[in-house]
């Protein structure tokens, strides 16, 4: 069960160049305690990749990761925070 101040989020990461992959992986390894799931798909027709992450953490932690990803050259990141329908009692 989630603690009160923790959220679940999904981040979509569009990686436009192979040179950007190392920076993305290095950054994600620093936030590995937040990652619940990861899936990567190559888009060869665009010479790019799409990574989706399922995360659990505080709003500050999740926002910091998303912001840092978006500052990497050749990387676009979008975050979606999920709302719990049944909050803990």
Can you say where each PLM-predicted feature lies in the sequence?
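Long, contiguous binding/interaction regions
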Residues: 1-89
